Amino acid sequence: MKTFIYFKIAILFLVFSIHAQDSIPKAQVFKSIQTLKTGSQNYKFNTLAGTMELRDEKNKPIALHGFTAYFKQGETKNRPIVFSFNGGPGSSSYWLHMGIMGPKRIVVTDPDYNKAAPYKLLDNPYSILDMADVVMMDPIGTGLSELIGESKG
């Protein structure tokens, strides 16, 4: 009897696992407006955070590639764009984002060891956003990025 129950549980697990693999998540992008204050200047940015779908040579979806992007509002004709590929394996671009490149930064007291969150959040006067737009990208398998479809597993 016990073996039969384990068999039923295994079948249910397989059925729900197969169903979960059939649903491929869709790329999403979230938009907001952020402000960076450096010295006496205030800069407004269009902020995008989300994922973009990557496809293979047969046009099958293989991954969602995560990103966070800041684009200055106003005159942008000759403004450079910095593409930042940080993180991995196992770590997203979060620490580069919240440590130096983004409009905000977290305050840490020790460069070698820090306690768990929550961290104090401040405007980031060291950000390069006053000089360039920034696109931070998470390697596949970190942060917002993930394998999807037949590539998963």
Predicted regions and their residues:
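Bacterial Sec-dependent N-terminal signal peptides
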Residues: M1-S23
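Hydrophobic alpha-helical segments and their boundary regions
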Residues: Y6-I9, V29, S127
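Catalytic-loop region of hydrolases
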Residues: A20-I81, G99
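N-terminal cap/lid subdomain of alpha/beta-hydrolase-fold enzymes
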Residues: P61-G153
